[in-house]
């Protein structure tokens, strides 16, 4: 796509063929305290010999980009900023809707100004910013489109808050969309670690992270579930990306989840990504879908 062409934007669902994705540049990425996942990494650096390696991180991120391109996905990049080392996790700083992008309000201190690089991208790309979160905090990882017209909103208190989720729910209602709000335990960070849509009517779900009424609601929405264990979920086992047409971007350490997906007939592209997962985010955290073809 040359500079004179408009970047496609807008999604009705988080399934369907992914055509355009927003990624962050990892130039200034490093480990900083973000969430319970990165807290465990810092606590175990000596006994587990965890060491951040910049060259490895750059190679792993580039390999992820190559998988997108091999699958026909156009990759767009928000600029890096030395003061925003975690802005590479573009899932959280905004989320796409049919009406334009929503700029998130991130609670964790190292990321509170991620909106600067993300909003700059939308302005330069001439993609409309539909809303800004102003009622406390809500992050893009807690916005899940179950199917066109139906959303699942999460909040843990440590990141997204109930007030933030309710603001998004109000906007959805005004547009004739349903929004179902569910609290999640803080160790899962965001709803996208708990429920990830794979294709129309099919999701990866960590049932241990959800109250029974949320499982009942998914059943009423006719969503078939592939279960993810608690053990795998807290290691970002469900944090993967549907590419559409029965293709999935996953991570190499997701042995159980990848095997389940292959048994379901999915083509699984599993990349090494530990420099980022140890820093608090997986491949789903690292992308933001700008446009998908309808299912």
Language-model regions: role of each:
Residues 1-295:
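The feature marks the mature, well-folded catalytic cores of soluble enzymes
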